[in-house]
C-alpha cells in the first residue's frame, strides 16, 4: 500500500513539474507575434479611453511608447501565415506586413506628438487613423477575425 501511495505521489509531482514545460514549448513564433499584437491592441484601447483626460497625460504617453516598442518588436517577427506561402506570394505577404507596421508606427508617433502637445482633436484623428489601419491591414492579410463572435443567426437571405 505504501508503495502505491509513493508511486502515485511521485507521478503527481513529476506531472506538476513537467506541466509548465508544456506551456513554454507552445511559445512559438505565432504566439510571440500574437502576444506583441495583443499588447498593442490592449494599450490602444486604454489610450482611446484616457487620451482626453489631462490628469492621465503621462500614463497615455507611456502607453503609446509601449505600443511603439511592441510594434518595433513585431516588425522583427515573421507572420505565421507567411510560412504557409511560397515564392512571390510569401514575399508580397511579408512586405505588406512590414509596410502596414511601418505605417502604424508612423501614426503612433503622430499620436504621441498630439497627446504631448495637448491637441485632443488631432489625437482623436490619429486614433481613428490607427483603428482604420488595423482594420484594413487585418482584412488585407486575412487575420484578426479569430476573436469575433461567430454565433447567432446567419445574415438575412441565407
Positions of PLM-derived features:
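Charged, amphipathic alpha-helical oligomerization/scaffolding segments
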Residues: 35, 39-42, 46, 62, ...
Amino acid at each position: 500500500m505504501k508503495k502505491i501511495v509513493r508511486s502515485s505521489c511521485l507521478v503527481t509531482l513529476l506531472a506538476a513539474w513537467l506541466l509548465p514545460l508544456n506551456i513554454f514549448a507552445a511559445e512559438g513564433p505565432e504566439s510571440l507575434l500574437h502576444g506583441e499584437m495583443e499588447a498593442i491592441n490592449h494599450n490602444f484601447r486604454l489610450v482611446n479611453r484616457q487620451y482626453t483626460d489631462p490628469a492621465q497625460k503621462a500614463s497615455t504617453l507611456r502607453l503609446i511608447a509601449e505600443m511603439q516598442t511592441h510594434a518595433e518588436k513585431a516588425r522583427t517577427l515573421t507572420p505565421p501565415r507567411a510560412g504557409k506561402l511560397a515564392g512571390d506570394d510569401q514575399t508580397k505577404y511579408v512586405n505588406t506586413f512590414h509596410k502596414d507596421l511601418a505605417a502604424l508606427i508612423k501614426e503612433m508617433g503622430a499620436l504621441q506628438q498630439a497627446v504631448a502637445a495637448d491637441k485632443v482633436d488631432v489625437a482623436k484623428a490619429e486614433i481613428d487613423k490607427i483603428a482604420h489601419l488595423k482594420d484594413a491591414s487585418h482584412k488585407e492579410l486575412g487575420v484578426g477575425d479569430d476573436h469575433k463572435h461567430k454565433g447567432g443567426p446567419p445574415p438575412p437571405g441565407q
